[in-house]
Amino acid sequence: MSDAMQLAYDTLQGRVDESAQPSDWFEITQGRINDFADVTLDHQWIHIDAERASTGPFGTTIAHGHLTLSIMGHLPRAVEQNAPRLEGQKLMINYGFDKVRFPSPVPVGARVRTTSTLKRVEIKGGMIETMNEIVVEVEGQEKPCCVAESLGRLVF
């Protein structure tokens, strides 16, 4: 292990269980939902048919769970604070998720934001692997809409 990688590992180990500041709020519009439906070919009525959804279980259209998951990359502030660019780091790659849950829906027009807590740091495959618990909340809603254990690998 290089000196830079060891220093980065030690730095991140000291930040385990630290939570970052929440990201900025991000609005989930019907246009964004429709665009996501087109890209993923998931045109289920609960997402795109406002008239039918108005009589459905949520009273309106809702975002796809995977749309919520995918915008975690757009709301990087929380993640970047827990995995800052470290000396000698070439890049950070998305390695996947250990666990993903969608406890509540995201109604059209809602605003969401993320908070990230660094939970684990390990050396794997010549890289530093981090696991962040990311919570996506909906403004004014008690339950989060997504809780995920996101894995990243820092390349040195």
What are these regions (language model features)?
Residues M1-R15, F102-F156:
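HotDog/MaoC-like acyl-thioester-processing domains
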Residues S2-I93:
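Hot-dog-fold acyl-thioester-processing enzymes
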Residues G59, F97, P103-S104:
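Short, surface-exposed secondary-structure edge patches
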Residues M92, F97, E129-M131:
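Short coil/loop residues immediately preceding or within conserved phosphate-binding loops
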